[in-house]
From Swiss-Prot:
Family in the record: Belongs to the FGGY kinase family.
Catalytic activity: D-xylulose + ATP = D-xylulose 5-phosphate + ADP + H(+)
Lineage of source species: Bacteria, Bacillati, Bacillota, Bacilli, Bacillales
Domain of life: Bacteria
One term of GO molecular function: D-xylulokinase activity
Enzyme type, top EC level: transferase
Site feature Important for activity, where: 10
UniProt keyword terms in alphabetical order: ATP-binding, Carbohydrate metabolism, Kinase, Nucleotide-binding, Transferase, Xylose metabolism
Gene Ontology biological process: D-xylose metabolic process; xylulose catabolic process
Binding site for substrate: 83-84
Positions annotated as active site in the UniProt record: 237 (proton acceptor)
Claim: DNA-binding is one of the keywords in the record: no
Name by which UniProt lists this protein: Xylulose kinase
Biological source species: Staphylococcus epidermidis (strain ATCC 12228 / FDA PCI 1200)
Length: 496
C-alpha cells in the first residue's frame, strides 16, 4: 500500500483548501476552512494574515486525524495562493496591518502615478489596481507610520509558508504579479522601487519547486506531523490551477470560472505584443510563461443572478433554465461588469448592463444572457491572444463553468475550440501537490507527474453553425462597453 503523501494547500479568497495526494495521484483526503473578508469601505478588500495561519493549522489537524490518513505519512507540502495581495511585516515577521487583496480597488490614483512615469505597461504588464506596487504606494501615502516599519513584503501564500517554516521567500510565478519583477530575467527591478522610495524590502527569489525548509519542530508536533516534512515554494493560484489541470504545454489553455474568471494560455516564448490588458506571467513550470486575461465578475455575476432573481433555485436549476432559452437569449445581452472589468478594458468604474430587454423576455432568457455574457467576456481574452498569433489546440475548463455540460458546450461554441473536462478536478491545490511531489523527487519532471496525476473525462467539440451565430451576437456585445462607459461613470458620480 502507498503510504507516503504530499499536501497541497491552496490559500483562496473565500477558503483554504488542503488535499493529501499519494504517489499515484489519488486524493486521499480533502478539507476546507472558510475565511473572513473585511470590506470596510467601498473598493476595500482585506483579510487578516493571522486568520490564514489559524485556518491552515485547523485544516491540517482535521486532515491528519481523519480515518483515511491513519496509515499515511506526510513527506512534503507546497502552496498555491491568491495573487497580488500585499502582506507587510516588521523585523519580527509580524504583520503590520491586514493584507490588501487582489480585488481591492482603492488605489486608482496610485496606478495613475505609476503610469505618469512608466506609461501603460510595466514589466510587460498593464498597471492595474489589482497589482501589488499600487497597494504599496497607497500604504506609503496614507499610512506612513506603518510603512516606515516595513522590513519585508510578501504575497499571501508566502506569508503562510513563512508561518510553517520561519523562512522568507517568494517564487517567480507570484513575484511577476507585483509589477516589481522582470519575468524575462527573473530578477527584481529595484530601480522601479527606488523611483517610489520603496526601500530594500524584497524577499529572496526561488523557483516554484524549490525546497525552502521544513515545518518547524514545534509546529510539526502541534499539527501531528513528523519532524522532517519538506516544504516547497509553490505558485500563484493561476499557475497552480493550470498545472493541476494539466495545462503545461504550448498551445494549451485553461478557462477557470470562479468568483473571477481566467483564461490562461501557455507560452514557451513570451509574447509582448499584446494590445490590451492581458497579463504576462511566469508559469510554475520552469522556463515557461503564460498570458492571462481576467473577467472580474464571472461566477460573481452568476451568484448575483441567483441572489437577486433565483433565491430558491439551485445553480443546476438555473443552468437548466438557461439551456431552455435560445442562442442569444432571444436578443438579450448582459455585460458582467458588476465589479468593473480587467480584460480587455482595465476599467474599475465601468458597470454592467442588460441590453435589449423587452416584455417578451423570461427568466430563462435572463439566465442565459448572464451565462453568455460571462463567456463573451472570457472570449475577449481569447480574441486578443489569437490576434497576437497564439493558437489554442484545446482549452481545459475548470471551476463553475465545468460543472454543466450545457455551459461546457456553450464555451466550445463561442470560443470555437475543443473544450476538455477533467475526470477529477481539485484545482490549484492539486497543482501545489504536484510541485511538492516533483520537489521530493517522486517524478523526474513536472510533465511526467502531471501525466500520472491528471486525467481528461470528456471532450466537447465546437459546433460551427452555433459559433457563427454567437459571433453575430458577440459583435454587438463588443460595442456595449464604449456605449455605456460614460453613462455608468455619470451614474457612479451621482450615486457617490
Amino acid at each position: 500500500m502507498v503510504k507516503e503523501v504530499v499536501l497541497g494547500i491552496d490559500l483562496g479568497t473565500s477558503a483554504i483548501k488542503i488535499i493529501a495526494v499519494d504517489q499515484l495521484g489519488n486524493v486521499i483526503e480533502s478539507v476546507s476552512e472558510t475565511l473572513k473578508l473585511y470590506q470596510e469601505h467601498p473598493g476595500y478588500s482585506e483579510q487578516d494574515p493571522n486568520e490564514w495561519f489559524e485556518a491552515t493549522k485547523k485544516g491540517i489537524k482535521e486532515l491528519i486525524q481523519s480515518t483515511e490518513m491513519s496509515d499515511k505519512i506526510v513527506k512534503g507540502i507546497s502552496f498555491s495562493g491568491q495573487m497580488h495581495g500585499l502582506v507587510i511585516v516588521d523585523d519580527n515577521g509580524i504583520p503590520l496591518r491586514k493584507a490588501i487583496l487582489w480585488n481591492d480597488t482603492r488605489n486608482s490614483i496610485q496606478c495613475r502615478q505609476i503610469e505618469d512615469i512608466y506609461g501603460e505597461r510595466l514589466n510587460y504588464n498593464p498597471i492595474l489596481e489589482g497589482f501589488t506596487l499600487p497597494k504599496m504606494l497607497w500604504v506609503q501615502q496614507h499610512e506612513p507610520e506603518i510603512w516606515n516599519r516595513v522590513d519585508v513584503f510578501m504575497l499571501p501564500k508566502d506569508y503562510l509558508r513563512y508561518c510553517l517554516t520561519q523562512t522568507i521567500h517568494m517564487e517567480y510565478s507570484d513575484a511577476c504579479s507585483t509589477l516589481l519583477f522582470n519575468p524575462e530575467n527573473y530578477e527584481w527591478t529595484k530601480d522601479v522601487g527606488d523611483t517610489f522610495n520603496i526601500g530594500d524590502i524584497y524577499p529572496p527569489l526561488v523557483k516554484s519547486h524549490s525546497y525552502v525548509g521544513n515545518v518547524t519542530s514545534s509546529l510539526a508536533k502541534e499539527l501531528g506531523l513528523s519532524s522532517d516534512v519538506a516544504v516547497y515554494a509553490g505558485g500563484g493560484d493561476n499557475a497552480c490551477g493550470a498545472i493541476g489541470a494539466g495545462v503545461i504545454h504550448d498551445k494549451s489553455a485553461l478557462c477557470s470560472i470562479g468568483t473571477s474568471g481566467v483564461v490562461l494560455n501557455v507560452e514557451y516564448q513570451r509574447v509582448t505584443s499584446y494590445d490590451s490588458n492581458l497579463h504576462l506571467f511566469n508559469h510554475s513550470v520552469p522556463d515557461t510563461y503564460y498570458a492571462m486575461g481576467v473577467t472580474l465578475a464571472a461566477g460573481y455575476s452568476l451568484n448575483w443572478l441567483k441572489q437577486t432573481f433565483f433565491e430558491n433555485e439551485s445553480f443546476e436549476e438555473i443552468l437548466n433554465l438557461a439551456a431552455s432559452s435560445k442562442i442569444g437569449a432571444n436578443g438579450l445581452l448582459f455585460t458582467p461588469y458588476l465589479a468593473g472589468e480587467r480584460t480587455p478594458h482595465g476599467d474599475a468604474q465601468i458597470r454592467g448592463s442588460f441590453i435589449g430587454i423587452s416584455g417578451q423576455h423570461t427568466k430563462a432568457d435572463f439566465a442565459r444572457a448572464v451565462i453568455e455574457g460571462i463567456t463573451y467576456s472570457l472570449y475577449d481574452s481569447i480574441k486578443i491572444m489569437r490576434r497576437a498569433g497564439h493558437e489554442m489546440n484545446s482549452i481545459t475548463s475548470i471551476g463553475g463553468g465545468a460543472k454543466s455540460r450545457f455551459w461546457l458546450q456553450l464555451q466550445a461554441d463561442i470560443f470555437n475550440v475543443q473544450i476538455k473536462r477533467l475526470k477529477h478536478e481539485e484545482g490549484p491545490s492539486m497543482g501545489a501537490a504536484i510541485l511538492a511531489a516533483y520537489g521530493l523527487g517522486w517524478f523526474k519532471t513536472i510533465e511526467s507527474c502531471v501525466e500520472a496525476f491528471i486525467k481528461v473525462d470528456e471532450v466537447f467539440e465546437p459546433n460551427n453553425e452555433n459559433h457563427d451565430l454567437y459571433e453575430q451576437y458577440y459583435s454587438v456585445y463588443e460595442a456595449i462597453y464604449k456605449q455605456t462607459k460614460q453613462l455608468t461613470a455619470d451614474l457612479l458620480t451621482i450615486t457617490n
